[in-house]
């Protein structure tokens, strides 16, 4: 015992505890890495999950595919997420599993064909059906008398590959019946509200022939509701995967139901179809990679006593929220509230406090659905409750040169969904301590369109993102955008003072709105509920309001003459309502834009009156996340289908780049550890070889690949099932042509049918999915070096895969199994009595050796990994015999344990002066030789049945 820790001055007994019973840290169990699509969750980075329930919580349910419907609004559920089923197969038997969810990314040097995202086939508006295309918007305007100011709204957007879309009906100020675009055309019925106004649309194909005539409205309960009567499935535009009978040339994208419902009441309404584009950019082009959603900047209260000069843009920016990962799920499903805003009360601590609450987007203020809560936050950079420290501010960016993620930020992320970006002055402690979050910048939107009253040339102002000239398809307008004409080429005798608005988020205007138990429960800021009687129901058009803008426009910065912030919300614009209390507070409040500058708000009554807003109980507001993008081609059922990858490179295909980057992300063994790797459903030979080469370079993982030539999934083309089955000979010849010779890869054949245990749907999955499950089953019930095949460990009918396997896409004959196994492809056999079984365990190594079997390769991976961990703890010790003995004292017992569990027949470890010579000692090297005799599995059984005569004896 050391006496240095004690201070001896006067006599006494000194006691200390020394705990030598602590257990050494154990290494985590290794599982597979699975790369592919998932419903939601972290994207383009490896994430570990330890159970299937954790997988569902993080990445959502596996998707069986086959679901059509409103894909634009509800998301793509039309193709299976094979990676999710592979993760399920493993996690049902074992754990953990590392998942890389794929989204669309692009090579920094990609050419136009290699850009991520999607676009319509023709992106520009023209007057010819064969070349016309892009985004076309329907604007709806209430009827009004001449020269009356009237406001209309963008109500819907259609996206056309070619052909055209236009209205049919009676034009304004005339009884003439016309069909066309760029002209105000009256509704076809007698509406009782803006939503019930009906319009007739005609849709032409590329030849100019009318293919669809549709009457629709915006009443959600009507059979003519716009989202019920138009195609909302973008994949139907894809001729490569859709049969001729099912093909469409357009789809309905955004609809803004609440904006239509809030139009002023009128006896009639007019619609006009205009192209959404300008001289440079097109509304039908979204060709860019995945990006994260983010909020607008949150800014402070006004600390001055000069309300007349108040401008929210002059307030101090404090922070904003950014999704941890790219994609659209966060913005469609989450919103953020700032609540419990409190002024400082302690003279020793001049900083106020507030809480951040991440809520479900579909909740309402009367019933919060809280996902995460971070309480008692402040803006003091030296505090443990500093906002960035409480939530986290770290993020990663992919370095395409070094092929790695670079990490930025100061504080680990505590939130599963967002990080904080602090204003630099706030982060440096250079702002007043009294500052608190009081408002936020609204999302970026296109500028509204104004037309001048009384002009005979009612053309649009510069920078407007609409077009209605003579050269857009079926235009009835002339002279720019003179769409107020009563008919073509005849100028109108009267004009409207007209504004066309691009929709924006509705804001809470009164604390008494909604079904709240108290006005103090109201969160000002954005409102994600419907208006009217259904006020507590989610407003589905919210999903369209949070979407990213087309290529060429920023979602965070204004573009002069084209886009601007929709609003600047601030609690400084709350006006008191009701009788003021003796404590100078208000029982209710209204949000009135510019009320502080007009000196009618609560906070405009004097210095520090912003505190009255908080004391009155209105210190909370809600802001959205916007602008996230998946970077995928929404016209694909399977955005990474193999038929898109043929003869492609990272520069010519975003799908190829995304898949390759997903593999590159897990190439470094110091970044992520795993023992198996798979990209389920991927049959592209070059990418599969890259996966195998990655595992071989690491030396610690086996790649499970799916082969070209077998079954092709329904999302690959528009062929019938019988034409997509594939065959054994093609699969073998395609593999042999590549000359693959590696013990770090394995392949199986054919695809199998499984039952989704959540939805009870039947689907076909690639063989790598069940192969992964079988390996987990073998590892759980025996050891990883036992052959993952045969009826004991590979019986798929008996549940060995972790999934319920019901069928194979092709029943293999004995000869076909022989041919597959001779080509190092492991057959999945189906027997009448025994059921479906994995009937082989070869690697893709052609050279005969013990390593041409999966159980031996997995044994070697395991042994190398464990002994390398032991060796790592020996580094920087003295290179002497005592150290060698210590190393042997750990390795030999470990190998004896493997031998005792039937992994090795025998072994020998040599570490002495014959291996670590004086020369190696001088070079700081310890060198050991480890000899292994792997235990082989029985794959062939020979039995001779000898028939003897009745007089033979068996004594010998």
For the regions a language model picked out, list residue spans one by one.
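Structured, hydrophobic secondary-structure cores that serve as assembly/anchoring elements
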Residues: 1-311, 329, 344-353, 359-365, ...
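Conserved aromatic
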Residues: 49, 371-376
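Extended, Lys/Arg-enriched charged tracts that mediate electrostatic binding to polyanionic substrates
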Residues: 309-333
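Prion-like, low-complexity intrinsically disordered regions in eukaryotic regulatory proteins, enriched
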Residues: 338-341
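Surface-exposed loop/edge segments in extracytoplasmic proteins
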Residues: 364-372
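Short, flexible N-terminal segments of the mature chain
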Residues: 374-386
């Amino acid at each position: 015992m050391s006496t240095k820790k004690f201070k001896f001055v006067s006599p006494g007994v000194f006691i200390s505890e020394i705990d030598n019973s602590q257990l050494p840290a154990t290494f985590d169990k290794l599982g597979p890495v699975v790369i592919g699509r998932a419903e939601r969750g972290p994207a383009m980075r490896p994430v570990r999950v330890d159970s299937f329930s954790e997988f569902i919580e993080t990445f959502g349910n596996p998707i069986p595919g086959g679901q059509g419907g409103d894909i634009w609004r509800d998301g793509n559920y039309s193709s299976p997420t094979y990676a999710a089923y592979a993760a399920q197969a493993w996690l049902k038997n074992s754990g953990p599993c590392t998942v890389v969810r794929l989204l669309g990314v692009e090579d920094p040097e990609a050419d136009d064909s290699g850009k991520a995202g999607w676009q319509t086939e023709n992106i520009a508006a023209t007057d010819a059906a064969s070349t016309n295309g892009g985004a076309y918007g329907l604007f709806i305007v209430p009827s009004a008398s001449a020269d009356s100011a009237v406001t209309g709204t963008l109500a819907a957007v259609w996206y056309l590959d070619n052909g055209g879309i236009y209205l049919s009906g009676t034009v304004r100020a005339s009884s003439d019946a016309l069909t066309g675009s760029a002209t105000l055309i009256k509704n076809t019925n007698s509406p009782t509200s803006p939503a019930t106004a009906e319009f007739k649309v005609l849709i032409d194909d590329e030849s100019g022939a009318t293919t669809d005539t549709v009457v629709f409205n915006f009443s959600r309960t009507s059979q003519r509701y716009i989202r019920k009567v138009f195609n909302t499935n973008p994949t139907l535009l894809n001729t490569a995967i859709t049969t001729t009978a099912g093909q469409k040339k357009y789809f309905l994208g955004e609809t803004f139901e609440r904006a239509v419902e809030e139009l002023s009441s009128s006896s009639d309404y007019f619609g006009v179809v205009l192209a959404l584009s300008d001289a440079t950019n097109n509304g039908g082009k979204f060709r860019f990679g995945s990006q994260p959603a983010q909020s607008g900047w949150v800014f402070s209260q006004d600390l001055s006593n000069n309300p007349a000069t108040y401008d929210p843009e002059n307030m101090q920016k404090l922070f904003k929220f950014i999704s941890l990962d790219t994609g659209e799920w966060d913005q469609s499903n989450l919103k953020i509230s700032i609540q419990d805003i409190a002024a400082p009360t302690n003279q020793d601590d001049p900083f106020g406090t507030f809480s951040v609450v991440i809520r479900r987007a579909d909740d309402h203020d009367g019933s919060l659905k809280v996902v995460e809560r971070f309480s008692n936050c402040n803006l003091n950079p030296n505090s443990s409750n500093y906002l960035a420290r409480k939530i986290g501010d770290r993020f990663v960016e992919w370095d395409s040169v070094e092929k790695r993620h670079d990490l930025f930020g100061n504080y680990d992320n505590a939130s599963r969904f967002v990080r904080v970006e602090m204003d630099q002055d706030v982060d440096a402690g250079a702002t007043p301590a009294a500052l608190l979050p009081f408002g936020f910048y609204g999302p970026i939107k296109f500028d509204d369109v104004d037309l001048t009253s009384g002009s005979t040339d009612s053309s649009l102002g510069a920078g407007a993102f609409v077009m209605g000239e003579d050269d857009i398809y079926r235009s009835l307008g002339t002279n720019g955008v003179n769409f107020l004409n009563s008919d073509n080429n005849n100028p109108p005798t009267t004009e409207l003072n007209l504004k066309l608005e691009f929709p924006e988020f509705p804001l809470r205007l009164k604390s008494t709105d909604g079904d709240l138990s108290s006005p103090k429960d109201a969160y000002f800021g954005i409102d994600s509920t419907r208006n009217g009687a259904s006020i507590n129901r989610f407003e589905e058009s919210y999903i369209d309001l949070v979407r990213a803008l087309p290529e060429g426009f920023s979602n965070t910065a204004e573009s002069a003459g084209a886009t601007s912030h929709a609003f600047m919300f601030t609690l400084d614009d709350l006006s008191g309502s009701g009788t003021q209390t003796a404590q100078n507070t208000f029982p209710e409040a209204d949000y009135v834009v510019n009320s502080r500058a007009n000196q009618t708000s609560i906070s405009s009554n004097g210095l520090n009156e912003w505190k009255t807003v908080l004391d009155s109980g209105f210190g909370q507001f809600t802001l959205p996340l916007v602008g996230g993008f998946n970077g995928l081609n929404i016209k694909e059922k399977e955005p990474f289908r193999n038929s898109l990858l043929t003869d492609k490179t990272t520069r010519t295909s975003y799908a190829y780049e995304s898949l390759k980057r997903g593999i590159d992300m897990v190439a470094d063994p110091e970044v992520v550890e795993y023992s198996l790797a798979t990209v389920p459903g991927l049959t592209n030979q070059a990418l599969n070889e890259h996966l195998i080469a990655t595992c071989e370079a690491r030396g610690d993982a086996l790649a499970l690949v799916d082969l070209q030539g077998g079954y092709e999934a329904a999302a690959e083309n528009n062929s019938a099932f019988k034409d997509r089955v594939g065959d054994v000979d093609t699969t073998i010849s395609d593999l042999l042509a590549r000359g693959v010779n590696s013990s770090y890869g394995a392949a199986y054949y054919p695809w199998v049918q499984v039952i989704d245990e959540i939805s009870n749907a039947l689907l076909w999955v690639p063989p790598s999915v069940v192969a992964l499950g079988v390996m987990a089953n073998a590892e759980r019930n025996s050891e990883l070096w036992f052959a993952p095949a045969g009826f004991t460990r590979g019986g798929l009918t008996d549940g060995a895969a972790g999934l319920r396997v019901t069928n194979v896409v092709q029943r293999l004959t004995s000869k076909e199994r022989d041919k597959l196994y001779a080509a190092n492809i492991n057959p999945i056999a189906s027997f009448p009595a025994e059921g479906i079984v994995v009937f082989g365990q070869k690697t893709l190594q052609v050279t005969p050796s013990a390593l041409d079997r999966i159980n031996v390769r997995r044994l070697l991976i395991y042994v190398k990994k464990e002994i390398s961990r032991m060796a790592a703890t020996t580094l920087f010790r003295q290179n002497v015999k005592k150290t060698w003995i210590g190393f042997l004292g750990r390795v030999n017992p470990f190998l004896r344990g493997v031998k005792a569990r039937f992994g090795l027949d025998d072994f020998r470890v040599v570490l002495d002066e014959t291996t670590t010579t004086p020369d190696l000692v001088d070079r700081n090297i310890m060198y050991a030789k480890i000899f292994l005799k792997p235990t082989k599995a029985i794959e062939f059984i020979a039995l001779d049945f000898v028939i003897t005569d009745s007089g033979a004896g068996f004594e010998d």
